[in-house]
Amino acid sequence: MLESVTHRDANGDTPRYVAPELSYLLDRIVNVCFIGAPGATDRGWTLVDCGLPGSASRIKRAAARMFGERSRPAAIVLTHGHFDHVGAVHTLAHEWDVPVYAHELELPYLTGQSSYPPPDPLVGGGAMSLMSALFPKRPIDLGRHVREIPADGSVPGAPGWRWIPTPGHAPGHISLLRDSDRTIVAGDAFTTTKQESLVAALTQRAEIHGPPMYFTPDWDRARASLIHLAGYAPAAAITGHGPPMRGERLQNGLRNLASHFDVWARPARGRYRDHPAITDGSGVVDLPPLQVSTRTVVLGGLALGAAIAIATSFGRDDDERRRTEEIARLSPSTNDDGASDASEGDGADTRAGDVSLLARTLNESVSEIDAR
């Protein structure tokens, strides 16, 4: 089985190996993928997704390390257009003068026509879920750069790859498959970390989960997409969130998740639990009623505290890092289902423990409010 090879420089800008001619860059909590052989010529490789806002320079440095200083991609392919996958797309499309491809049902959100269905911050039981209420939701407009991905299933600039429709997490979500070795770029059709938990998202603890609950507006389609991907028995996969996964661990995990999707992946309650957002080629058509909870009273405080913790978390020394790990280990946050996040602090290199404590305190306060 192939092992993940990591070569980290001082800035963390060197892509990591997933499979032959497939590497990825971790941009804080989201992955950006590079399809192409190291040293590929100008326009001889493809970028998949564009990370968080402000990540253009890191992506360009990573591309230069992979393919050379002057090498530009043949195309940018978007698995979907959520803010954490298109953060640098404006800058990169302009500076590289490169086309951006997405499924036709994603185009309304990439051409300024429609906002996505709003997130549901009260599902998933983690700080990241609660923070989602403040995530950017407005559409972007890529203008002349964006176009519909070829209907024949081919992936521009990536011979040997094809795209697969995997809607649910987003109306026009796609994943990429290389049949020759059953390698998948999944996007957010499933994840390999518990993305609803800020601690897990920051520490990248490896475990298979469904799509991020807070941003998934159609659970029936999400389940069908996961079952479809599991049917390929992929040998390797890189998702939008979490480390690469391979072999039997990946295959067994996907099979189990597909078999228990409604229990393990679909939230126990929430706005989209039983009633999806209705969308079409023009964007959002109709939304299920908003489920208001007194928990929203503390939402702003949690989001602000977590955001501050993230902003100040990088570049900590080893002593502080060990202190943070210990806090996260000893002070688990409790999710909506009563499950503990204690083990998610393992290997933390951020102030994840502080965020975990904050989430726990606020969740306990919310429970008291809801009980009144």
Give the residues covered by each predicted segment.
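Conserved beta-strand hairpin/beta-sheet module of binuclear metal-dependent hydrolase folds
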Residues: 8-69, 176-187, 192
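Active-site HxH/HxHxD metal-binding segment of metal-dependent hydrolases
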Residues: 54-57, 64-147
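Intrinsically disordered, highly charged
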Residues: 1-8, 38, 42, 231, ...
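Residue-level marker for buried hydrophobic side chains located in beta-strands
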Residues: 46-48, 77, 100, 183-185, ...
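C-terminal/domain-terminus segments
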Residues: 119-126, 130-131, 236-269
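Metallo-beta-lactamase
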Residues: 2-6, 52-54, 106-167, 171-248
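Hydrophobic alpha-helical topogenic segments used for membrane insertion/localization
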Residues: 289-318
